[in-house]
């Protein structure tokens, strides 16, 4: 299960990337097919994460990213809420901090219908992420956060 977990997570991440690229380039021809493929790989990763808790928080975060990408923001927030609660319960700090970052980033996005999740604003999630990135010396993540803030 551990080796298949890495494969399923990688496949899901690749499918999300391709879906993002198709959405950005307005590739309507492939969008439907890529949505379906990402959904299937997400379900496989999610089912596998139930057997191997190692990447559970990451998988839940990616499910949120998938649903946000396809325009289902409320579902995305529900997945991110699950990711946060699971990350807090498991003490999975790196993935929890990355979930905070994703939530903050998406709540700040121009097309966001929501301004908070569980009463916590985008800025507060980004502050939480930054604090954790610094504590864990996650320089790449900190650089990504800095890029986001510079672009605001």
Q: Can you annotate each of these PLM segments?
A:
Residues 1-152:
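Helix-coil-helix junctions within alpha-helical repeat/solenoid scaffolds
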């Amino acid at each position: 299960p551990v080796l298949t977990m890495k494969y399923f997570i990688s496949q899901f991440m690749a499918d999300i990337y391709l879906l993002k690229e198709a959405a950005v380039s307005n590739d309507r021809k492939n969008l439907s097919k890529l949505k379906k493929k990402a959904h299937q790989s997400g379900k496989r990763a999610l089912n596998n994460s139930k057997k191997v808790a190692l990447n559970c928080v990451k998988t839940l975060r990616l499910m949120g990213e998938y649903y946000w990408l396809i325009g289902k923001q409320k579902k995305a927030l529900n997945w991110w809420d699950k990711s946060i609660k699971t990350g807090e319960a498991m003490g999975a700090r790196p993935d929890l901090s990355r979930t905070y970052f994703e939530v903050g980033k998406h709540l700040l996005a121009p097309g966001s219908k929501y301004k908070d999740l569980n009463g916590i604003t985008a800025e507060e999630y980004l502050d939480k992420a930054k604090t954790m990135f610094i504590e864990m010396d996650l320089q790449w993540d900190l650089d990504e956060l800095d890029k986001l803030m510079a672009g605001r």
